[in-house]
Structure formats: C-alpha cells, structure tokens
Amino acid sequence: MPRDGSFRGSALITHLHWDHVQGLPFFAPILAAGAELDVYGPAQETGTLAEAFHQFVCPPYFPVTIEELYGRISFHDIEDSDVELNGVKVRARTVPHVGSTNGYRVEMGGASVAYLSDHQMPQDGSHSVSDDVLELCDGADLVIHDAQFTKAEFAEKYYWGHCTVEYAVFVAQEAGAKRLALFHHDPAHDDEAMDQIVDAARQAAASTGLEEVVAAYEGLTLSFGG
C-alpha cells in the first residue's frame, strides 16, 4: 500500500472490541499527509462511531488525537443498510454478539464474500440462525465465520459472544455457501489443535454441499472461478 499520501481506501469495522480496532492509528498509509480513509461501522448506544473512536485514539491511551494524524479519517455509521463503495456492493446486517455488531456481505465482479467475524450462537447450543445472518451468507462464494470454540469449550464459555466450529459449518450449509473459512481462532489453540479442528470441520461438512473448508490465516489467498 502506498505511504506517500496517495492512499485512498475504505475499511469495514464489525464492532468496537479492542482486537478489531486498536490497529487503526498504526495503519501506516494513513500516517502520510494527503491520505484518506473512510471507516464504516455500527453506531453505539452511547454515540456515533466517530465519537467512540475519538474516545480512545487520544491521550493518555494514544500519543495524539485522530485530528493530529497526517492523513484524514472519516467515520460513517452503517447498520442494516446497503451501500456501494468504489463499485463494490456492501451489505451490512446486525449479527448477534456482545454489543453493537455488524456482519458484512461484499459483492464485486460476480463474486460474493460474507464476513461474520464474531457471532454468538444460541447459548443453549441449538443451531438456529437469524434471518439477517442467512441473508448475508446466502449462496456466498466464501463465508468467513467465527469458529472460536470446540463443543467442550463452548459449554464453559457459552456467553462469550462466539460459536463452535460445528455451528459455523451449519450456518454455511443453511445458507448454501460454497466455501467456509474458519475465523477468530482461540488464542489457546496451537497448530496441532487447529489441524484437528479443521479436520473435524471438514468431516462435518462432507455431506453438506460445501466445496471447501479452510482455517483462515494471515496471508491466505483464495481465488474464485469465473
């Protein structure tokens, strides 16, 4: 990405938990004068998306305020609506989690990707899915979905705002998606545990019509036919 001030881009924020927003003021392209970034995400019960970011990108939590960054950051509240960003169709819908949370569907060039990074499955362990979630994932070429817990882990942490690997497979199956990328891995899962989780997910998906199940990781590239 350019760091000479020519950067123009948009970012979709699902919610305001630290693991999803703390990188914003460290985003190198926006540290150059002339750069522009538009950030889209859900408004909060206590105020707008912009107000929420201004509360933590400032001293004493960060050395400077948003206004003191060299580039320009603009914030846009988006919830249960559809927008078009530079020719890319974006659909935002509310997803069950802890606090105001969006899921997104992105469509471009005949391909569709659904992104549900954090998704609270029914706390009783049942496999019902909200209409908004199914709408986002409907027939998607790729669903990137929360899959933090095994069944045993969920039994202890059912109220943490996440779901099991099996539930992620179920959502993709119910929506008629083609591919599933397991996401939001538990930090306690090492490589061996992740291999076992992916194997279990693939077995669960074997008779569902899903073409592929992978574990998302930094640098992963997936291609869509067309």
What positions do the PLM features span?
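Short, basic, glycine/proline-bearing loop/turn elements
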Residues: 113-120, 154
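Active-site glycine-centered loops adjacent to acidic/histidine catalytic or metal-binding residues
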Residues: 15, 118, 184
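Cap/insert and terminal regions of metallo-dependent hydrolase folds
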Residues: 122-212, 216-217
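Binuclear metal-dependent hydrolase catalytic cores
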Residues: 1-114, 124, 133-134, 194-226
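Fold-independent oxyanion-binding glycine-rich loops
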Residues: 78-79, 117-119, 146-147
